[in-house]
């Protein structure tokens, strides 16, 4: 689920070039209550499928992380679009750790429009290693747990999800 996105903001450019030409924007904050009711209805009626929630509006991140933590099979997605820079990735990971479960985080992603996205994944892993290293150096986390967490969010969590 991509939340808080405003698609095709420039109508002249959309008319000339069509969708996915670079005029999407950060959208308004979403209603946490509406998201909770929707996820609860899905969970009650049919069981919660594997669900990943991405927000393009960083002001929603803590709320969405806490909501994701309240439901089985719901995870926070990586910082995306306007948030996939050093500060955005760091903030998304820290907010997820504080309000949900970083241990189930799926790490960086890409889409079919990306070409040679190794650099994006390498960049993410370097930032993740920096965060985990800060926690270890600050005495907040032990080294073995940090290595295990790095492996999970860089490889094992998505492997497990895609093999289900």
What do these predicted ranges mean?
Residues 1-4, 52-54, 76-79, 102-120:
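Short acidic/histidine-rich active-site segments
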Residues 1-59:
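Divalent metal-binding pocket/active-site signature
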Residues 9-18, 61-70, 86-93, 115-130:
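Histidine/acidic-residue-rich catalytic or RNA/ligand-binding cores of hydrolases
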Residues 13-19, 72-75, 105-110, 132-137:
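Short acidic (Asp/Glu) and glycine-rich catalytic loops that position anionic groups and cofactors
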Residues 25-29, 119, 145:
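Alpha-helix capping and helix-loop boundary segments enriched in small/acidic/polar residues
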Residues 44-48, 70-76:
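Glycine-enriched alpha-helix->loop->beta-strand junction motifs that scaffold or abut catalytic
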Residues 56-59, 76-95, 142-162:
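C-terminal helical cap
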Residues 103, 120-164:
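Mid-to-C-terminal alpha-helical segments outside catalytic/metal-binding sites
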């Amino acid at each position: 689920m991509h939340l808080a996105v405003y698609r095709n903001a420039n109508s002249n450019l959309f008319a000339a070039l069509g969708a996915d030409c670079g005029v999407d924007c950060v959208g308004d904050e979403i209603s946490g209550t509406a998201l909770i009711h929707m996820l609860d209805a899905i969970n009650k009626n049919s069981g919660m499928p594997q669900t990943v929630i991405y927000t393009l509006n960083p002001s929603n991140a803590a709320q969405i992380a806490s909501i994701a933590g309240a439901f089985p099979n719901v995870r926070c997605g990586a910082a995306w679009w306007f948030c996939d820079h050093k500060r955005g990735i760091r903030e998304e990971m820290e907010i997820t750790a504080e309000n949900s479960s970083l241990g189930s985080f799926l790490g960086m992603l890409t889409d079919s429009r990306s070409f040679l996205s190794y650099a994006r994944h390498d960049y993410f892993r370097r930032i993740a290693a920096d965060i985990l290293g800060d926690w270890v150096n600050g005495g907040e986390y032990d080294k073995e747990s940090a290595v295990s967490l790095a492996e999970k969010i860089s490889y094992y969590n998505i492997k497990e999800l895609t093999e289900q």
